[in-house]
Amino acid sequence: MIFPAIDLQDGRSVRLYKGDFAQETVINPDPVDQAKQYETAKVGALHLVDLDGAKAGKPINVDIVKAVRAAFTGILEIGGGIRDKAAVDLYLGMGVDRVILGSVALKNPELTKQVIAEYGAERIVIGVDGKNGKVAAEGWLDQSDVPMTDLIGAMIEGGAKYFIVTDVERDGTMQGANEDLLGNLQKEFPTARIVASGGVRNLDDIKSLEAKGVMDSIVGKALYEGTITLEEIAEYNQQN
């Protein structure tokens, strides 16, 4: 499945370059309107990131997420600033399908396992962000020495299934996904569902990832640059 992304900052839809909060491009001043366009196109899935929340460590753009949920009927997932159970309960309680736990999975694995046990692996997604195979946290501002493989292995033991793996060095660059990293992780953890994020350009990239067993991808800049279209995403998702 392909998830088009909407990144929220200051109430607008933006794109960052390599996760740098200072290097933003405003995509749409009205993210809800953008979500309605995705709904009309029948893309079937949407990946939301609360960038303000990622920085603040708590949900910030809650009203926008609620309005997006009302406008969009497909699978909706949200990440950014979800660091405690109250935030998980908040989003799942308003009808969001999946929440993405990134920093908290690294820093509070017991809480992460607790919410997986309560809500199930279909609703709790682990965000594994980083570079050089090591995990980054706190909106990518904090680079750790923890290997991605350690975090994924521990979370699988805790019941997790979905892992959105973002290579920070590729995000927003249009250089192609880090296929070696993603393919190797999928091979090492065959029960996991590795989701590609960062650098995905077009359907060729997505099919190349598929060949390595990586069946889900998130696209952001590629959609705005026109190298992949809403129509292509909708058609792909309806067939898969």
Region locations from a protein language model:
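Conserved, mostly hydrophobic/aromatic
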Residues: 7, 38, 46, 91, ...
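Short secondary-structure boundary segments
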Residues: 6, 50, 103-104, 128-130, ...
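Active-site-adjacent loop and "lid" segments of alpha/beta metabolic enzymes
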Residues: 17, 132-144, 173-176, 184, ...
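Conserved anion-binding
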Residues: 11-14, 18-22, 92, 96-171
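N-terminal beta-alpha supersecondary unit
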Residues: 13-59
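Active-site-adjacent beta->alpha loops and helix N-cap segments on the catalytic face
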Residues: 2, 53-69, 83-89, 103-125, ...
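Short, acidic/polar
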Residues: 27-39, 83-89, 144-154, 206
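Catalytic cores of alpha/beta
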Residues: 72, 76-98, 180-216
